[in-house]
Structures are given as C-alpha cells and as structure tokens.
C-alpha cells in the first residue's frame, strides 16, 4: 500500500482514471497533453481501444476454494508482484522534472515491469540505478526502434543491457510515425525537446528501419545478449513468424492507436495471437486498459502481462513516483478483487474465463 496515497487512487471510487486524467491535463503543458492524447488520423483505433475491453464478457468459476488471490507472477522468468506493467512513452521529462527516473522508481515500488522508451530523457544507467535503489530486483526492459545502421544501433542495445535491462521490446509497427494532428513545432517553444535523445550518441541510431525482417531479432540477441519481444503485432500469422524467428515474447499493440488508424483493437486481436503462439512464447498486450477489470479481461484472453501507457504518464504528471506507484497498486487491487470474484487464485488461472467452458 502506498503511504499517503493520493485521493484519486481509490479503487472504490467510480471513474478514478478519468479523474486522474483531468488532474494531469490541468498541470501538463498544453502541447504535451495534446501530444500524449493524440491518436492517428481520426483517432478511431485510440477511441475503440477502451470500449473493446469493456465488451469482453467473463465466465467466472465457483467452488474452487481460491481464498485471497496472489497477483505475483513472472515475465520471461523474472518475478513481478503484479501482471500490470508500464508501457514505454517518450517526453517524460516534459511531464515531470525527474522523468523516467520517477517512473522507474514508482514501477519498482509497485513490483511492476517497466518498459523504457529508447527515446528516454535520462541515460539508461541512471534509470536502472533509480529502479534498483527502490528494489534491487526491479524488472525493466528497453523498447527499441531498430535503425538500418547496425553499427549505430549496437551501442544503444548494449548500454541498456549493461544498465540492467532484462529484454528488448522491438517495435515493429512504426516504419515511420503515423500522421497525428498534434501540436505544431512552434507550440513547443520554451520546452527542451532534446531530452528524448539522451541515449543516442550517434544520431543515426534514432532513425527508424523501414524494412525490418525476422533475422533482425536474432541480431539483437546476439548483439546485447537479451531476449527479444516483438511489439506491435495484431495478426496471428505475424505472431507465428515472430516465434519462428526466435522471439521470446509477442506484444499485441497498436501503439496507443497512434500508427495506422482503424487497426483492429488489441482486445479483439489478442485471442488469435495467443492461439497462434501457444506455449512457444509469452504474449503481452496494451491499448485502452483503464481498470483492474480490463486487466482481468486481458488475462482471460491469454495475456501474460498487461501494459498501460497513458495512465502512468498522467500519474507521473500529478504526483511523480508516488503517483505512478499509486496507479499501479490501485489497478492491482482492482485486479485482486476481480480475480477472487472470478474464482482465480493467481493471474494465470484467469486464462479461459473469456470463453464458455468445454465440458
């Protein structure tokens, strides 16, 4: 439990995520809020993401004697206290002076996976240190865009590995940023945007690769020694190709609805990806998750971990590391209640609740 938890972080209060978002909007610079909330083109994928989780229906179990649930689990063999994690976002030093350092500390305090954007405003070594200062066993991954110039990309991957990253989440849905009707460059006057290049000594490392292939996964692991998770998958056939290329995990994601608009929601895409992957790799999901019930729905459809993107940034803006911890713990408390009501003692037991049982 977070000491002196913020008033909005109360799982008994209906609509607390919207309250948190409203508080964040009050304190964030207007261009940062617009950037954070933007969806690609018409925002259809972004807007449908939230409703898609609410449309999932559950078949709870009874008479299983589960008692109080335990939300602990593992991601790629690393222990976490909750299946709820923090998805990568950039520009965090515009949100809060401590940026990713506060995000890392808050996630570590909650025992949650933290995925760090390659466009972080702090050095990976600083982020890893901030997490370990709270929990020596804190689990964090690097999210990476692979540049076509491997000579430039390799130092970034190795720096993250040296700083304690446990995996590389390779984003594959972004050959270039999709069009968003977000702030114009002049709207950012007075804000230092150079922060999001803290880990790029070579500017070539920030370029996006427009021709990624399966063999790039093996190169990443060979270069930095870390397992590779493929982020940005919504198709079952692509999920199979990821596994066959050596991916340790497949991350169902639409980039927060910020790439190809009208892409299917992650809640809709998840079951087929899980079925295609089987037990050959772990499956994760993000996109529109706003409550512990949403997390349960994702677990029921087969996700190992559930990542949230915008809400942690809202919490960071409002209350720094304390806010991030409070957000994650509140979602986990909601999940624990939902697990017990669904007849599940642990998160992995929720798989299958999203479909009627076979007799």
Name what the model sees in each region.
Residues 29, 278, 319-320:
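Glycine-centered helix-coil hinge/cap
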Residues 85-91, 139-145, 203:
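Short, basic, glycine/proline-bearing loop/turn elements
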């Amino acid at each position: 439990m977070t000491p002196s938890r913020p008033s909005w972080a109360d799982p008994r209060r209906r609509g607390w995520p919207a309250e948190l978002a409203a508080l964040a909007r009050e304190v964030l610079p207007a261009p940062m809020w617009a950037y954070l909330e933007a969806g690609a083109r018409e925002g259809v994928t972004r807007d449908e993401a939230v409703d898609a989780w609410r449309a999932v229906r559950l078949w709870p179990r009874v008479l299983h004697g589960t008692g109080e649930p335990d939300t602990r689990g593992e991601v790629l063999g690393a222990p976490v206290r909750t299946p709820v994690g923090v998805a990568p976002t950039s520009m965090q030093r515009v949100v809060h002076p401590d940026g990713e350092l506060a995000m890392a500390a808050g996630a570590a305090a909650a025992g949650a996976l933290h995925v760090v954007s390659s466009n972080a405003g702090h050095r990976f070594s600083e982020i890893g240190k901030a997490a370990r200062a709270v929990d020596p066993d804190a689990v964090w991954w690097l999210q990476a865009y692979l540049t076509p110039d491997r000579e430039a990309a390799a130092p970034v991957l190795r720096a993250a590995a040296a700083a304690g990253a446990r995996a590389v989440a390779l984003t594959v849905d972004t050959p270039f940023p999709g069009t968003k009707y977000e702030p114009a460059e002049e709207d950012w006057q007075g804000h230092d945007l150079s922060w999001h290049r803290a880990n790029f000594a070579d500017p070539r490392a920030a370029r996006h690769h427009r021709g990624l292939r399966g063999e790039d996964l093996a190169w990443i692991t060979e270069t930095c020694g870390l397992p590779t998770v493929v982020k940005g998958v919504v198709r079952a056939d692509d999920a199979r190709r990821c596994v066959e290329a050596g991916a340790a995990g497949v991350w169902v994601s639409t980039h927060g609805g910020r790439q190809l608009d009208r892409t299917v929601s992650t809640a809709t895409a998840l079951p087929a990806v899980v079925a295609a992957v089987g037990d050959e790799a772990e499956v994760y999901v993000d996109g529109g998750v706003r409550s512990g019930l949403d997390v349960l729905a994702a677990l029921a459809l087969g996700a190992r971990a559930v990542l949230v993107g915008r809400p942690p940034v809202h919490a960071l803006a409002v209350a720094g590391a304390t806010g991030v911890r409070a957000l994650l713990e509140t979602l986990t408390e909601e999940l624990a209640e939902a697990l017990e009501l669904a007849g599940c003692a642990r998160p992995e037991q929720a798989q299958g609740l999203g479909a009627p049982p076979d007799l």
